[in-house]
């Protein structure tokens, strides 16, 4: 049965050749050049405003092609596994955070929780969340290249009735997340939080995570930043 399944998969690949989800290059699900973006890009950070406060927000890329197309495929393709790419994006950001000195300045945290942005109940039900892979990569890099112990804690949830952000304006995105997240576990004293999202556009999701974990918040991080 396994042989037949593998043979059928190979036959589909021959009959319907794939193209790179990032740039469209023929006969590659993800071409080497696009795959290399996860480690080749240099993460940057800026201060993100959140009401009367602000915090560091790390980003790996602008939300433009080919990164945009890769992220869209990761979120919506049921046939393509991009978890390794997402993990390496997290590693890249985590290395930059660890090497920046940010963790030894302005925070008393001796350990970190890396908290992925909450997926909708539908994505959680079908295992379609992608930020968890980025969080795992970031935690591995920070924990391996700093004196701070680091682990992934999936402890942020959306209220179940909250709708998708797709098709909403910036203001609608902010309003749809405001007040609709909660932590499933209290963050212990001496533990800092880094929040992870795939894309930050209006900042609604990341700022709501900041509200939930404000007392413990160290920084936010994302694969891509949309400035439209």
List the predicted regions and their residue ranges.
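Glycine-rich phosphate/pyrophosphate-handling loop used in enzymes and phosphotransfer proteins
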Residues: 1-228
């Amino acid at each position: 049965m396994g042989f037949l399944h593998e043979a059928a998969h190979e036959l589909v690949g021959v009959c319907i050749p794939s193209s790179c989800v990032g740039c469209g290059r023929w006969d590659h699900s993800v071409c080497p050049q696009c795959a290399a973006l996860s480690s080749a890009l240099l993460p940057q950070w800026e201060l993100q405003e959140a009401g009367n406060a602000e915090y560091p927000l790390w980003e790996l890329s602008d939300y433009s092609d080919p990164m945009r197309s890769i992220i869209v495929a990761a979120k919506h393709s049921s046939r393509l596994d991009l978890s390794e790419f997402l993990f390496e994006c997290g590693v890249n950001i985590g290395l930059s955070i660890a090497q920046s000195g940010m963790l030894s300045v302005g925070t008393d945290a001796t350990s970190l929780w890396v908290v992925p942005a909450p997926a909708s109940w539908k994505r959680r039900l079908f295992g379609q969340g992608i930020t968890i892979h980025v969080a795992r990569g970031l935690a591995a890099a920070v924990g391996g290249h700093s004196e701070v112990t680091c682990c992934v804690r999936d402890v942020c949830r959306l209220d179940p009735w909250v709708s998708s952000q797709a098709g909403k304006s910036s203001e609608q995105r902010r309003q749809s997340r405001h007040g609709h997240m909660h932590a499933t576990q209290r963050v212990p004293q001496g533990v800092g939080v880094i929040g992870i999202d795939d894309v930050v556009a209006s900042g609604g999701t990341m700022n709501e995570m900041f509200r939930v974990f404000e007392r413990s918040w160290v920084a936010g991080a994302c694969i891509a930043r949309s400035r439209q």
